[in-house]
Design a protein with these regions (language model features):
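N-terminal leader/linker segments that precede catalytic domains of diphosphate-processing enzymes
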Residues: 1-119, 123-143, 151-253
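Active-site recognition of the HExxH zinc-binding catalytic motif
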Residues: 147
Length: 253
């Protein structure tokens, strides 16, 4: 479920690892070994699980604790009861081009979700995203956008401005939280596509880590209609976000 909000999102960290029953941990480990055998590029890094969400008139507070990517992926693929589900926390960026196109990425074949459509983003990282003892989700979004699309949110020649705009909350079998910035790019659709294609070629030539295979540009006002024509798997929040964006354009908001 996507919520449109201007509130700042802050974290409260519990410095312990999430405890899982041994029989569930065994299933997760067996599943993970099977996935790595299919795709050696996978890495079982740290993931942060949201245990509680609170808010006041200005802020949203997320209490988090550690788990791992295997736990997250198992939950995504097979589902886990709410008590032990992985409510992972991520930060991302939704981009709008200068000429009014929503930018949605298509994950590369080497990722854990080939062809999946989603915005740029990823999990918070203790090595890079800490400010004053807590996670800064803007830093997460900036880091992921630079790694995945070679775009710098602070570069005025690429991005005009950005704001907190959306937060994804758990819904149905998807247990994730994702804080999503909205960024207005200086680039047009054609310019951003050219920029990305050059970056993708660079990653191929240097054996760099690729997240997205291509970008899809969906004209705001009819973005959901264009999205529905694509047969790719899609993150649940993508359609919900674009419904809000289409409505805003059609109502001149």
């Amino acid at each position: 479920m996507v919520i449109h909000t201007k509130k700042q999102v802050k974290t409260k960290t519990i410095h312990k690892r999430m405890s899982l029953p041994q029989n569930l941990r065994d299933k997760i480990d067996e599943f993970w070994n099977e996935q790595v055998a299919k795709n050696p590029n996978l890495f079982n890094g740290e993931v942060w699980n949201v245990t509680k969400m609170e808010e006041n008139k200005d802020n949203i507070f997320l209490t988090i604790e550690k788990t791992d990517y295997a736990h997250y992926l198992y939950d995504e693929r097979h589902g886990i009861e709410e008590k032990y589900a992985c409510h992972n926390l991520a930060g991302g960026t939704y981009i709008v081009t200068k000429d009014g196109y929503a930018v949605i990425g298509e994950l590369d074949e080497i990722t854990s979700y080939p062809r999946m459509m989603q915005v740029s983003g990823g999990g918070i990282d203790e090595k890079y995203d800490i400010v004053n003892g807590e996670f800064d989700l803007i830093k997460t979004a900036k880091r992921e956008l630079k790694e995945e699309l070679n775009l710098d949110l602070d570069n005025k020649e690429q991005i005009e401005n950005y704001n907190f705009e959306y937060i994804e909350k758990p819904e149905g079998k998807r247990h994730s939280y994702c804080v999503i910035l909205k960024a207005y790019s200086i680039y047009t659709e054609n310019q951003l596509e050219e920029h990305f294609n050059k970056y993708y070629q660079f990653l191929e030539e240097t054996d760099g880590e690729k997240e997205f295979k291509k970008l899809h540009f969906l004209k705001l006002g009819r973005a959901v209609e264009e999205l529905d024509k694509l047969d790719n798997p899609k993150r649940l929040y993508v359609r919900q976000l674009l419904e809000i964006e289409d409505k805003g354009v059609l109502n001149n908001e």
